[in-house]
Amino acid sequence: MKNDPHSASTALPTESLVPGAAPTLEVNITAALASVDVMHHGRKVTIMRNQNQSNMVTPDFAQTSRKCPPFCIQPSELAPGVKTIAELDVLHFLKKISDGDASIMVIDSRTQTWVDKGIIPGTVNIPWDTLNIGESEPAAMQAILENQLGARRQDDFWHFDNVKTLVMFCNGPWCGQSSTTINALLKIGYPAHKILWYRGGMQDWESLGLTTLKPLSK
């Protein structure tokens, strides 16, 4: 596997997410990290944990049992070369993006109904059904691949030499929206080492009381 500077295995220590910051809250992210500032649609948003120690997970993510299929438990390893990551890694990548690294994108693969319930600050919504080979509208899919992900089409072949590193997620371990997108990208040749999967998704993010936002009105 190629050595990718954005690989989660090379993620900086969490202390480096907020240089010089010392935890001053009662509910911190780690023992050495209170919060992380990221940019979301041009404004600074502070990601931290809910300080109400009686707070419970939102009802949208309290349900334990959903019909399977489609809501089936996802594997811990999605595909060879695709690294599974967790919350501290996601925060690391969101911070890098906010600091100006345009080679990374954290993608929320959920459809609008789910997105309306809440989003992770600093992420970009590209619904799974817009990147589903054979089902998505071809011109729209090509536009996403070229304009947002950095792929290029030449002589009826896709070229991925300068594509972005993608961190992808959806609702969590019981949701297949991000895994469907990842498998679709791999099928057309997107490099596996350029894809990271936040398997825990919104379920785990909400369970840890991390900051969410409501999406901007379109």
Report residues per predicted region:
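Positively charged, proline/Ser/Thr-rich regional signature most characteristic
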Residues: 73-164, 215
